[in-house]
Amino acid sequence: MASKASVAIVGSGNISTDLLYKLQRSEWLEPRWMIGIDPESEGLKRARGFGLETSHEGVDWLLGQDEKPDLVFEATSAYVHKAAAPRYEEAGIRAIDLTPAAVGPAVVPPANLRAHLDAPNVNMITCGGQATIPIVYAVSRVVEVPYAEIVASVASVSAGPGTRANIDEFTKTTSKGVEVIGGAKRGKAIIILNPADPPMIMRDTIFCAIPEDADRAAIAASIHDVVSQVQQYVPGYRLLNEPQFDEPSVVNGGNHVVTTFVEVEGAGDFLPPYAGNLDIMTAAATKVGEEIAKELLSAKVS
């Protein structure tokens, strides 16, 4: 029995390269291939240095190999993954999608880590989604949340061409995740590319409308619990201060609101610590991939 599930990384940009470092440390996942389209990319160069087989000939090359991976992690762009996803499924390869394509069900570890382990394709939503949806989920499991709004602010230099090309998909996919996984009746997402120099760490603000008679202590306790869960795979995820409870006003649309401020400091594997927006995506994807790998490996034994 193989002790690890074999993995291919499709994409050789910032996210893929940071993911490579995390997969190298995994007890359940073995990165074997990295696929890109630029033969001179830093990602492919580093992957070769780790002993991975690499190609700049895209998904066609990977699917043309005799040996195929158990899992593929794709960090390209939404339209590229939408085209490749059915081909992975046809080849029997489980896909973890780090683009906003949302071909398969979305996963945020604290909320629904084990809900879709049998799905052929799972989606990691967006960096803003991974950072903020856990907080919405923490509130909605205590009280009804008729509306939630998240604002994700990331260092402009951490946003590569793929992120910039996917801005529209980012807002749509994150808003949907706030509703479907976070539990809000209606959700809205905003991303800000902060041009500050030196670059700012990722910071997120989460607004949740709550009932007038909401148990504030229970909401705060739930938020702290979920933050500790995220910290198990993203140690640099933290509350900036205690959740703030506000009375209805013109500013907040006449709602009782709880506002939560978080920041995400990256592990500094490939990218600087300020790029916590990329780190939380790759860390969450690794966490989900490990759970899928455990299921695959146990099935091979039985």
Curated annotation (Swiss-Prot):
Pfam families referenced in this protein's UniProt entry, alphabetically: AcetDehyd-dimer (PF09290)
Binding site for NAD(+): S12, G13, N14, I15, S158, A159, G160, P161, G162, T163, R164, A165, N166, N277
Keyword Oxidoreductase: yes
GO biological process, one term: catabolic process
Keyword list, A-Z: Aromatic hydrocarbons catabolism, NAD, Oxidoreductase
EC number: 1.2.1.10
Catalytic residue positions: C127 (acyl-thioester intermediate)
Single GO MF descriptor: NAD binding
Xref: InterPro entries: Acetaldehyde_dehydrogenase, Acetylaldehyde_DH_C, NAD(P)-bd_dom_sf, Semialdehyde_DH_NAD-bd
Catalytic activity as recorded in UniProt: acetaldehyde + NAD(+) + CoA = acetyl-CoA + NADH + H(+)
SMART domains: Semialdhyde_dh
Family: Belongs to the acetaldehyde dehydrogenase family.
Name of the protein in question: Acetaldehyde dehydrogenase 1
Organism: Mycobacteroides abscessus (strain ATCC 19977 / DSM 44196 / CCUG 20993 / CIP 104536 / JCM 13569 / NCTC 13031 / TMC 1543 / L948)
Organism classification: Bacteria, Bacillati, Actinomycetota, Actinomycetes, Mycobacteriales
